[in-house]
Amino acid sequence: MAAPARTAPEDDASAVLDELSRNFTYWAPGPGNGSLSSAWYRRNQIHLFGVLLAILGNLVISISLNIQKYSHLHLAQKEHPKPYFKSVLWLSGVLLTALGETGNFAAYGVAPITLIAPLGCMSVTGSAIISVLFLKENLRASDLLGMTLAFAGTYLLVNFAPNITQAISARTVQYYFVGWQFLVYVILEILVFCILLYFHKRKGMKHIVVLLTLVALLASLTVISVKAVSGMITLSVTGKMQLTYAIFYIMLVIMIASCVFQVKFLNQATELYTMTTVVPVNHVFFTTSAIIAGIIFYQEFLGAAFLTVFIYLFGCFLSFLGVFLVTRNREKEHLQQSFVDLGDIPGKQMLDKVQPDSNGLSYGTLPDGGDSTRGQCGEKKES
């Protein structure tokens, strides 16, 4: 009777090790790989394809943002700059942005939200690398540490995200759409959104947490609708027509409307705060909201082991920390000298620096010394 009791813990430990082996082995089957890794690869091929689409899409977005940034810098150096929206370079950046977002859109159709949403950190780290290589920005120690943490977090996310394969059909979306879990979630989200919107509009509260929470609440609806629309389009392409169902167009309207208002609040945040503050906070809020939406609407973590969930959340934490380190203190350096250099103006010979307006404080007057200055001038005139 004692022997079976001793072997039970060994069986449990063996099962845990087998699960870890399946999670940590994601390359193609080969001579050195066992049957577990081969089965894991075949079972998760479509997820890995979604991961590849998301990573490539985020990298393309990084390239597009740096191209647009370079076009702005290039136009600023011209004597008579034309509007940026007429620049071929800037327009090519916009097209690349659309291409990258298309990759993300397709990724949501073939992989879980909880796997694709956190991969947005690749856009931030990729943008930092491109800025160093092509825009000659400084590479800091915090950048290297942040990139390392982001890559480590991505590795854990890919391995420990929920291994579920869902065919997102119109009937499936309808079933989840009227489920009590989603209805409770939507009611709570609407209440929080209305309260924050009241304080934002009526009380003039423009704190970054308020603005980006509004963005995150809308983003949860965006990722739910994006996955539904993308999944139904994917099934329709394979021959199972889903575009005749009303739920497809309902989700399409939700996707467009949530995106529009999301951009509106995000623009308000970028106008009031620096990008080094907005980018990491928005990444954390958006990813958290998307993960919660995927868990509640699509039930992506249903039946997952505690260890798997814990390591997945730890991977999210590493990616969040990496984004904060990469974007930390990346504000533009401002010139400390208050003068205008005439050396680059055609037909003008530079003799000295032109001082600022004599009425300004930087001209040498004290903030409260206007009366004393005028008094001294008056004494000189009387004498």
From Swiss-Prot:
Membrane topology: Multi-pass membrane protein
KW Transmembrane (keyword) present: yes
Provenance organism: Mus musculus (Mouse)
Positions of the UniProt region annotated as Disordered: 352-383
SUPFAM superfamilies linked to this entry: Multidrug resistance efflux transporter EmrE (SSF103481)
Record key words, sorted: Glycoprotein, Membrane, Transmembrane, Transmembrane helix
Principal subcellular localisation of the protein: membrane
Residue stretches spanning the membrane: 46-66, 88-108, 115-135, 144-164, 177-197, 208-228, 243-263, 278-298, 306-326
Pfam families (UniProt xref): Mg_trans_NIPA
Protein name, per record: NIPA-like protein 2
Name of the encoding gene: Nipal2
Annotated glycosylation sites: 23, 33
InterPro entries, alphabetized: Mg_trans_NIPA (IPR008521)
Keyword Transcription (UniProt): no
One GO MF term attached to the UniProt entry: magnesium ion transmembrane transporter activity
Cellular component terms per the entry's GO annotation: membrane
Similarity section: Belongs to the NIPA family.
Subcellular location: Membrane
